[in-house]
Amino acid sequence: MPGVKVHPNESFDEAYRRFKKQTDRNLVVTEVRARRFFEPMTEIRKKQKISARKKMLKRLYMLRRYESRL
């Protein structure tokens, strides 16, 4: 879990900004949003299948784009 120690002579805004950066880097907010509601395994598998298909199509597009330049 991210934590920030406030340095002497440091404003609240600067400390808050550092805290926000740490939470963004650790993906805390996105994980909390994902776990907010229960998802059955069928939904998780469906999302994984969709993302795998998107990833494959993107790679195929990039490969074809690269080959057309040769």
Swiss-Prot record:
One GO term describing the cellular component: ribosome
UniProt xrefs under InterPro entries: Ribosomal_bS21, Ribosomal_bS21_CS, Ribosomal_bS21_sf
UniProt-listed Pfam families: Ribosomal_S21
A Gene Ontology BP annotation from the UniProt entry: translation
Domain of life, source organism: Bacteria
A molecular function (GO) term: structural constituent of ribosome
Record's keyword terms, sorted: Ribonucleoprotein, Ribosomal protein
Keyword Ubl conjugation in record: no
Record has Glycoprotein as a keyword: no
Similarity comment: Belongs to the bacterial ribosomal protein bS21 family.
HAMAP family named in the record: Ribosomal_bS21
Protein name: Small ribosomal subunit protein bS21
Biological source species: Campylobacter fetus subsp. fetus (strain 82-40)
Gene name, Swiss-Prot/TrEMBL: rpsU
